[in-house]
Swiss-Prot record:
Residues 1-22 form the signal peptide. This is Protein YceI. It is found in: Periplasm. Belongs to the UPF0312 family. Type 1 subfamily. Its main location: periplasm. Keywords: Periplasm, Signal. GO terms for cellular component: extracellular space; periplasmic space.
Length: 191
């Protein structure tokens, strides 16, 4: 009986300690504390900025063991917004995002490595029906208690993708072959 009680107590402590270290966060999109933005050069003369307004996701964060961190994000590609209705309609077409056939893009991390003050988050990005590995450079912006009794953590991440890697072959000129991703998220720790 004592052995069983001791085993149960040790197992409880082990699982409690593990879950306290690696916390799961839900991206706070309702509070407008998360953004999935992008930019691409327009003819080499200026930047064109856009955002995806509808997305959801979670991340697991363990500051002491980044290799245990995980990121999962789903983006509704129909929500693309560049502040120009005709351009947005074109981006939703089969020439670009093909939202009728591929209504979602997803990112699922496969590894997280600490590089100085940053985290290199490598994962599989599925966009336009194609899945390719992508690495995002992320920085912890801050973490701690919020005024409502919860805990939060915020990150900013950047990365680049080549359009042709995702079967987007419309010729936009040599200056417009890559899209830069700028992602800012604040997560609310789940209980």
């Amino acid at each position: 009986m004592k052995k069983n009680l001791l085993g149960f107590t040790l197992a409880s402590l082990l699982f409690t300690t593990g879950s306290a270290v690696a916390a799961e966060y839900k991206i706070d999109k309702e509070g407008q504390h998360a953004f999935v933005n992008f930019r691409i050069q327009h003819l080499g003369y200026s930047w064109l900025y856009g955002t995806f307004k509808d997305f959801d996701g979670t991340f697991t964060f363990d500051e002491k063991n980044p290799s245990a961190d995980k990121v999962n994000v789903t983006i509704n590609t129909n929500s693309v917004d560049t502040n120009h209705a005709e351009r947005d309609k074109h981006l939703r077409s089969a020439e670009f995002l093909n939202v009728a056939k591929f209504p979602q893009a997803t990112f699922t991390s496969t590894s997280v490595k600490k590089e100085g003050d940053e985290l290199d988050i490598t994962g599989n990005l599925t966009l336009n029906g194609v899945t390719k590995p992508v690495t995002l450079e992320a920085k912890l912006m801050g973490q701690g208690d919020d005024p409502w009794g919860g805990k939060r953590a915020g990150f900013e991440a950047e990365g680049k993708i080549k359009l042709k890697d995702f079967n987007i072959t419309t010729d936009l000129g040599p200056a417009s072959q890559e899209v830069e991703l700028i992602i800012s998220v604040e997560g609310v720790q789940q209980k």
